[in-house]
Amino acid sequence: MDNTMIIDVHTHVFTSNRPFSATFLAEASRARSTPIDMITRYADYRATAANCDVTICFGGKAHLVGLWVDDQDVADYVKQDPARLIGFLSLDPTQPNWQAEMEYGHQELGLQGIKLMPMYAGFLPQDQQLDPLWRYAQQHNLPVLLHTGTTFVAQGPIETTLPRHIDVVARRFPEVRIIMAHLGHPFEGECVAVIRKHPHVYADVSALHYRPWQLFHSLMLVHEYGVWNKVLFGTDFPFTTVDASLTGLRSLAEVKIDRFSLPAEKIEALIHRNALELLGLPHPGKATA
């Protein structure tokens, strides 16, 4: 694969405000101090993503906090640009029929990975009741992306989102490709420790560039532990964009604090990392050619 490609592993599909409870929308606006438009429009994404070649997208299911995106919405979104979009299904394993939803999303809708939101839905990813999920992902080579780190939602239990829980999962299901979102912030040290020890566990840098000091510190941990190769590019659209994320990441190469700095070539390698190969996903353009 061309090493100049950019693959965004973390974008959302919210085709309307219907998936959100009023409380969820209010808390999202409170976190930004201003009302936020949560609706994703693919034309808006592409307008700020001219250099992005492939994009992974997903909805989200978390009954606890009032978020529920039907997987059909994601499948329909992918149809807008099947040569560049890869859709993941979402699951809330605290709710009935999640196993049937998993099989339907994968086998009938053609979605190619799984998105989990442990903190938003209120479950531990290593709970043995989720073993059928991890076995299915391992059997069918479905990568699993989990929200890790903090949230603006008051009802989201932080203890369910710690990166250490993925260590347990990866020891039991070592062949599953796992992505921990947001570098597990503010628990980046734990996240780095976990991606370092497990060959198929990765992290993305989505939604971090607007906290530049924190991201600089996080990537210094990545640098010192030698795990640049385990970190993937992602945005968290619609909360930010490809262009803003690229600018934010590249600006960190200009920062020097005492004797500490981040190598520009490592940041560029992160931006152009072949996430599809690492996650075992086919290029959608080749699949539809």
Question: Where are each of the predicted segments found?
Answer:
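Mid-to-C-terminal alpha-helical segments outside catalytic/metal-binding sites
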Residues: 1-54, 227-232, 244-289
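Hydrophobic/aromatic residues located in beta-strands of well-ordered beta-sheets
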Residues: 6, 55, 85-87, 144, ...
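Conserved, mostly hydrophobic/aromatic
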Residues: 10, 74, 114, 137, ...
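Active-site environment of divalent metal-dependent phosphoester hydrolases
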Residues: 12-17, 62-65, 93-97, 121, ...
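Short aromatic-enriched loop/helix-cap "lid" or pocket-rim segments at secondary-structure transitions
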Residues: 16-23, 68-70, 101, 156-158, ...
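Alpha-helical scaffolding within the catalytic cores
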Residues: 37-45, 69-75, 98-101, 163-165, ...
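Active-site gating/metal-coordination segments in enzymes
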Residues: 54, 64-160, 201
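Catalytic pocket-lining loop regions of alpha/beta-barrel enzymes
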Residues: 112-113, 126-233
